[in-house]
């Protein structure tokens, strides 16, 4: 207990710990979960959706998922987008029943996307499919977040806002050192 220290905006845990944090929470901060088979995103869509559903049911305020890189890098953009849309649908259905609004962050894993063009395409794909935030990296790959990737993503957010009026958040994460 450190009353002089500010509270975090959020505490990030694996999906199965959402209920534990919710029960122990004595202050106002968000519970963020990394979900949908984090960090690789390698499983059946049904498994990912069930994990997201359970996390939101148990109190997650924000859900972070990793872009389906296997589909995206193979040029199967619709498969990658549909996965995000399905996650968004599950989040909205479950949170709606609870009278809550739960945010979706899509981690692009920009170090694996490699090119500014891929980073831009993934940014627009995630935003159009329903992401509330786009995030650079899990921190589990190398390279992770880079200033160059951040610039591309922020420029895409600006262009998307100008075209749609919808505000999207940006989260730089993974491999950031000071």
Task: Locate predicted features.
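Short glycine/threonine-rich catalytic loop with a Thr-x-Gly-x-Asp
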Residues: 173
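Alpha/beta enzyme core
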Residues: 1-6, 10, 16-170, 178
């Amino acid at each position: 207990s450190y009353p002089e220290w500010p509270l975090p905006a959020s505490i990030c845990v694996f999906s199965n710990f959402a209920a534990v944090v919710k029960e122990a929470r004595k202050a106002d901060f968000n519970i963020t979960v990394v979900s949908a088979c984090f960090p690789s995103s390698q499983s059946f869509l049904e498994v990912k959706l069930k994990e997201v559903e359970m996390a939101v049911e148990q109190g997650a305020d924000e859900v972070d998922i990793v872009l389906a890189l296997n589909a995206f890098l193979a040029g199967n953009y619709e498969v990658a987008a549909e996965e995000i849309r399905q996650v968004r649908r599950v989040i909205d259905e479950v949170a709606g029943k609870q009278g809550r609004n739960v945010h979706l962050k899509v981690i692009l894993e920009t170090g694996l996307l490699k090119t500014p063009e891929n980073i831009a395409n993934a940014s627009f794909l995630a935003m159009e499919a329903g992401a509330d935030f786009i995030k650079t990296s899990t921190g589990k790959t190398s390279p992770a977040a880079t200033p160059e990737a951040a610039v591309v993503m922020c420029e895409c957010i600006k262009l998307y806002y100008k075209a749609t009026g919808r505000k999207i958040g940006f989260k730089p994460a993974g491999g950031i050192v000071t």
